[in-house]
A protein has these predicted regions:
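Sequence/structural signature of beta-propeller domains
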Residues: 17-642
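Sec-dependent signal peptide recognition
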Residues: 1-7
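C-terminal motif of bacterial Sec signal peptides marking the signal peptidase cleavage site
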Residues: 13-15
Length: 642
């Protein structure tokens, strides 16, 4: 038997050509008749060289048997679906954990397998859902947490953390929800590569990135007829250590093995003697693959073996370190690309009452306290970037100033800040002739206050702010251009240097003074510092300056030693913190940082970043707040290696 595959990584091409693939054939051996068990999954498992089976049963719950099918332990319940992960740490002990759907209760049960006693026992239940769950699958996250994906009859996929890997304790924390596929028959996660696979029964198998911080996108891995080789519906998925995907095809009386690392090439395995295989599960057994097959027509559990060496994937472990946020701001008021750029205003009279400003480019400027609570909002238009400076002589007194690039009015929106209270007030707009204003930052040289503003076409303008009675006007004093689209920028006032990002290229440096000066490209994007370059800010530590830049292409933040030839010290990510229930940050646009002590709680300052994908649970965008102490820890570890 030969099958012709015309599948590429993400696109079905009707005119493609591909070599014929010979089908393998393996015999089945009866493990159990369904008359006494009545279930749908036979999961082969292996622990310390010993082979076992996990069976689902409508009458007996979950059964653990030896390799010959002899019952060792069981639980109560009407169970049809399960998934399994071994070597999970709970309270200092190691267990196997089973997620099983009880059809009578309509709930997911979490069951542990104690390897010392070979006993199964239920340890918790997840909350009931409004729609019936159709499939479930474990995901062992890179942080060590164990989470579970479920897909329901409405097509909603939910991910929730079940085991806190850092505390080795059970938890129940909804991470994210999204609309997956209708009629999701099965799901499985490749923990090593971080892929979630969903089987849409009459369409094919879709692949998603499993990380909750990843962009929600999908690609078709293997399709049903007429667009692919699978005849009829797909009923079950499993994954091999090699990353190969097992796709059960009942009408073809077999299973497809899809090489997800090799252009999704597929090989078909005929299950000899089967009538309608509903599920095919697998485990590595030395140089072969042990298969567990449930046949829906005969009601039999069957066992088989495939002589195939499925070597575990060899992956490069990322050396990127991570920090966590201690708090997050109130989400903006609508979904979509809205939150963009933060700024930190320091209350020098009472630093613990400093403020965070944030732009909502669908609404205006927002003001938060240091715990992220929304204090005030100004509906002044689609403001994009914001910055602050201190002590301007204005209207007979000293006031702090915030400015923001306003895309609605093609202007610089000016705000005053009362130095002792943080009271924020909108003042006026300074018109520009930039067609599509974008990024903005400020520069202060003694009593001279400047604003740099750019457009999406790369054009930069520098304005001198001029107090004028009870208003502030702007005088255009300089213009220059970046080669392509910029956005984020920051000025080192003390050294009179402007740093600005060219999103696809890197970071440029030029004099901040209103003179004709040549820009120099000092930092280039690479495989670690990945475009787009977005937010920029400067952190000071032990008398040195460090530029922090958001690397939107891989959801990270690059740190560069400005006083050491702009050396890239390293990059870091912001991960979720289950204890505080604050998620990490991804797809970051703007950021702001200070090393100035902000009260007793933040003696080493603060980092604020925009979060493009707000999770725990899924919500509109917001900003994440990171204790500067964590930044100092990273810097110290990097500097010690120099």
């Amino acid at each position: 038997m030969k099958y012709f595959i015309c599948l590429t990584l993400a696109v079905l091409v009707s005119a493609c050509q591909s070599p014929a693939i010979d089908a393998l054939s393996v015999p089945l051996n009866t493990l159990h008749q369904n008359s006494d068990i009545a279930g749908k999954v036979a999961k082969p498992i292996r622990h310390k060289g010993q082979d076992y089976w996990l069976l689902t049963s409508e009458k007996l719950g979950v059964l653990l048997t030896d390799q010959n099918g002899k019952k060792l332990s069981s639980t109560d319940g009407n169970i049809e679906l399960l998934d399994w992960r071994d070597n999970i740490q709970l309270n200092g002990e190691t267990f196997g954990l089973i997620a099983a759907l009880d059809s009578n209760l309509g709930q997911v049960l979490i069951i542990k397998l104690d390897w010392q006693t070979l006993e199964l026992s239920e340890i918790t239940r997840l909350p009931k859902t409004s729609a019936q769950i159709e499939s479930l699958c474990w995901y062992l996250m890179p942080q060590g947490h164990l989470s579970l994906f479920t897909a329901d009859t409405l097509g909603e996929v939910a991910q929730r953390t079940v085991v806190d890997g850092s505390q080795q304790q059970l938890t129940d924390l909804l991470i994210q929800t999204f609309i997956g596929t209708p009629q999701t028959k099965s799901c499985v996660v490749d923990d090593t590569l971080g892929y979630l696979y969903l089987a849409e029964e009459n369409i094919g198998v879709w692949r998603y990135l499993a990380s909750h911080e990843s962009e929600l996108s999908r690609e078709l891995v293997i399709a049903t007829d007429p667009n692919g080789p699978v005849m009829g519906e797909i009923t079950h998925l499993d994954i091999l250590p090699s990353g190969e995907l097992l796709v059960t095809a009942p009408e073809q009386k077999g299973v497809w093995i899809v090489d997800t690392q090799n252009n999704n090439q597929a090989q078909f395995v005929i299950l000899e003697g089967s009538h309608k295989p509903e599920s095919v599960s697998a485990v590595m057994q030395q140089q072969s693959i042990r298969l567990g097959v449930f046949d829906d027509e005969t009601g039999q559990y069957n066992a088989s073996a495939l002589n195939r060496d499925s070597k575990p994937l060899q992956t490069t472990t990322s050396s990127m370190q991570a920090v966590t946020a201690y708090a997050e701001t109130t989400p903006v008021n609508a979904y979509g690309d809205a939150a963009d750029d933060p700024a930190i205003w320091i209350n020098f009279a009472d630093s613990g009452n400093s403020r965070v400003l944030g732009t909502n480019k669908k609404q205006g400027l927002l003001q938060y306290d240091l715990q992220g609570q929304l204090l005030k909002e100004f509906n002044v238009g689609r403001v994009n970037n914001v910055d602050v400076r201190y002590g301007m002589k204005f209207n007979g007194k000293r006031m702090d100033i915030a400015t923001a690039s306003n895309r609605s009015t093609k202007s610089i929106s000016v705000f005053t800040i009362e130095p002792k209270t943080g009271e924020l007030a909108f003042l006026s707009d300074i018109k520009t002739d930039i067609d599509d204003v974008y990024g903005l930052c400020m520069y202060q040289n003694a009593e001279q206050y400047y604003v740099f503003i750019n457009g999406t076409d790369g054009h930069y303008q520098q304005y001198l702010l001029k107090p004028n009675g009870d208003d502030i006007s702007g005088l255009l004093v300089r213009e220059f251009s970046a080669p392509s689209q910029p956005e984020g920028c920051v000025v080192d006032d003390q050294n009179q240097q402007l740093y600005y990002g060219e999103e696809a290229v890197g970071v440029w440096q030029v004099s901040a003074e209103p003179i004709d000066a040549k820009s120099e490209l000092i930092i280039k994007t690479n495989e670690i510092f990945v475009a787009d370059v977005e937010g920029l800010s400067i952190y000071r530590y032990k008398g040195q300056r460090f530029l922090i830049a958001s690397s939107q292409g891989n959801d990270s933040y690059g740190v560069f030693a400005l006083d050491d030839k702009n050396k890239h010290l390293g990059s870091f990510k912001i991960d979720m913190d289950i204890t505080t229930r604050v998620d990490g940050a991804s797809e970051t646009d703007g950021l702001a940082v200070t090393s100035y002590p902000l009260g007793a709680q933040l003696p080493q300052g603060l980092l604020v970043v925009q979060d493009g994908r707000n999770r725990l649970p899924t919500a509109p965008q917001n900003f994440k707040l990171v204790d500067g102490l964590q930044l100092q820890g990273l810097l110290q570890s990097w500097l010690e290696k120099l």
